[in-house]
Amino acid sequence: MQSKSIKIQGARTHNLKDIDIDIPKNKLVVLTGLSGSGKSSLAFDTIYAEGQRRYVESLSSYARQFLGQMDKPDVDVIEGLSPAISIDQKTTSKNPRSTVGTVTEIYDYLRLLYARVGRPTCPNHGIEISSQTVQQMVDRILEYPERTKLQILAPVVSGRKGEHVKILENLKQEGYVRIRVDNEMREVTDDIQLEKNKKHSIEVVIDRIVVKDGVASRLSDSIETALKLGEGNIIVDVIGEEELTFSENHACPICGFSIGELEPRLFSFNSPFGACPSCDGLGTKLEVDIDLVIPDWEKTLNENAIAPWEPISSQYYPQLLKSVCNHFGIDMDIPVKEIPQQQMDIILQGSGKEKIKFEYENDFGSIRRSEAPFEGVLKNVARRYRETSSDFIRETLEKYMAQKNCPTCKGHRLKKEALAVLINGKHISNVTDYSIVESIQLFQQLDLTEKEQQIARLILKEIDNRLEFLNNVGLDYLTLSRTAGTLSGGEAQRIRLATQIGSALTGVLYVLDEPSIGLHQRDNDRLIDTLKRMRDLDNTLIVVEHDEDTMLAADWLVDIGPGAGEHGGEIVASDTPQNVMKNEQSLTGKYLSGKEFIPLPTKRRKPNKRKIEVMGASENNLKNVSAKIPIGLMTVVTGVSGSGKSTLVNEIVYKSLAKSLYKGKVKPGKHKKIKGIEHIDKVIDIDQSPIGRTPRSNPATYTGVFDDIRDVFAQTNEAKVRGYKKGRFSFNVKGGRCEACRGDGILKIEMHFLPDVYVPCEVCHGARYNRETLEVKYKGKNISEVLELRIEEALEFFSAIPKIKRKLQTVYDVGLGYIRLGQPATTLSGGEAQRVKLASELHKRSTGKSFYILDEPTTGLHVDDIRRLLSVLQRIADNGDSVLIIEHNLDVIKSADHIIDLGPEGGDRGGQIIATGTPEQIAEQQDVSYTGKYLSPVLDRDKQRMEETLEAKTVSRS
């Protein structure tokens, strides 16, 4: 009998404390809890990992070696598991060949559609290319009314230069009488002189016919003769009316442009049969970018305005440039922007064939003279990039290059033959450039013949279904041609969700990781409906989620806690959402029921005169937007998914500030101007990328506190007696570390058909250091034991050393008291990594001129974590520094001093600023702002809660 639940006993993965739990099957189950409490350990590292492992175990050992090994999770028993599919945010392809269309398989169906009902059309003449039989040609001609006069012509020369004497002579010998030369009727016996260097057309008159009964067989004979002479092409000249062209070849009857047999691979940009030969189907080419070559047009040539020719290791290029400027009389002491265009063209594009006398003196004083044309800066960079075999030089030159649309295919990725196949006047790449919403309308309004409809019916059904699913998960603004690498984690996850629904599997266990990331409240209901639809197909959904709406919509809610890290890993509540709300032990329940909440700020900071002003932003879908970001405030940029928030903040504001402050080689998105940079001296982008990619990186090394701890150990009497400096206490360099494991503390043993086994080092037993180093102790602990301390314990341990205490205090303040000093960076979640970065910035002295940028910082955070994060961000703003956040979370939005709301919709229908002001001002603009619509009830609710809390406190005091 099929079990009704997934039974887990004795789960101990990571921080899970030997837990037992029953998870109901065929239900929407939400796992929640503080960041680091063990949600992912239970969902992904235990349940999914075991489901996946059991499937792989069923394969032969030969097949298993190709699949990579699955570790067996640390759990006693899991019963009732179904085949498991995980949809997380990390596994999206960054391959430039991957697009929304290919990931969702819609593009595969589109290729099939174009191969079956597409109409090849000559790109030069706009004529539909089709091969016809003689019978079809006769039938078409006989459609004309009786007494219609026409003549049948065989084209022997079509738009070719020459005198064509031989051809005319042959026609005379073969007995033909009339010909048409360049649209003029002539006799073959005439003296026809053609100009050698002009293009000519010659057609032979095969027959003159009047349409009447019984003419069909004569017409048929004449057409056959004409086809033979015209190599498969004929022209029917209807006297006084139109001209018809027929072809029995699959080619344009005028210019001969032909397409082979239509097959799906012709439309694939990942196949040599369909890909543009110039860019190999990528649609873009790496070209030298003038804005990166000359980043600052205010500089002069003598001030090294040309970045790739800066004299870093040699004076060769500056001397070459000087010779060019001397030859053409170019002033090297005026700003580059003032150099006349003609002279600038010589510097950038070269001198053509004109030779220049060039003199070069090397570092040893010897002089070399030569005379040669000047190739130009842009061609020089491109040539060196092409010809070098050095990875270092290639990487250096890449900084001056950018991806630009391929000039051959104009960014469409396909060869011209594929782009010549049309349906309703559009080629396949035109269709993929439509947004999902526009595509749905396009396919509903396709104008197909009855035969084409029959062929395309099933293909269109599949395409419509998949487009509808994408629309339902709030991705209506994406285009099918969008590359997968440019999608946010939430978008990529929802695309894969839509693909899974399209497959309509049943009896599957889906494990999802925060599918609501990057989704505006407006689209949340659609996502929840999608999840319920998957559940209704008899699937079990285990969703790791912090979103209130999703938790309340769940059939079953599991709260893991009570704290995070060492303080978590237990099941606090496992029940229906309604019962969890009544559970006094559950922190999540308290927030859901409103007993706990994030209060509104008692007062909001007022903007002063200082601001960063972006003018004329028009990158991606931004429509010439001008935005003002006040300095010293907490500003939140809001708007529905795809409205242009990331483009404005990450592509324009961050890159412009980084380029200006750090002379970075990044190219900001399109905008006219940015003002107010003088108000800041550093810009910090705090994202959720890992703080280090190896286990050697940890919170202690990242925040810099490990340096101070090593100083403390080096100052101990024992260390001084032994002559140990601080380097002795590093596990990254020889000296103090254990050389058997090179300071890793563990050894990896490869077990080909089984998972790799990691065992503690036999010499140091996981301590990372050699015996002599471990003999040095501070307050009874050696350096290895100190790295094992949790942040909260380390705070107590180093309370007498202000320098260390200050750095650790900030890590504790952002809610990471539970992580260990030496915890490998690879084991930290995205939210934890982001907070370590925040903490390492916080302990630095504030100048009031720092500008912090955070893109969806609430990802992976519980409401209680968000509360802590907000108090840290408010602290930054209290110091006079500026905070700019992209966010959908209403708790963050309601805490802002200033909001910039983009919209009104996503994609092409977005890209405008529709409202700015305080949260209260945005809430009043519900008619134009979706954010205002959802923010208004939250503000009212929290004001009421704050009043009730105040009353309760007053009553309890009295």
From Swiss-Prot:
Forms a heterotetramer with UvrB during the search for lesions. Signal peptide: none annotated. Pfam families: UvrA_DNA-bind, UvrA_inter. One of its GO terms (cellular component) is excinuclease repair complex. The gene is uvrA. It comes from Oceanobacillus iheyensis (strain DSM 14371 / CIP 107618 / JCM 11309 / KCTC 3954 / HTE831). ATP 2 binds at residues 639-646. Residues 1-232, 315-593, 604-935 form the ABC transporter domain. One of its GO terms (biological process) is nucleotide-excision repair. It comes from the Bacteria. PANTHER family: UVRABC SYSTEM PROTEIN A. Gene3D superfamilies: ABC transporter ATPase domain-like, ABC transporter ATPase like domain, ATP-grasp fold, A domain, P-loop containing nucleotide triphosphate hydrolases. This is UvrABC system protein A. One of its GO terms (molecular function) is excinuclease ABC activity. It is found in: Cytoplasm. HAMAP family: UvrA. Keywords: ATP-binding, Cytoplasm, DNA damage, DNA excision, DNA repair, DNA-binding, Excision nuclease, Metal-binding, Nucleotide-binding, Repeat, SOS response, Zinc, Zinc-finger.
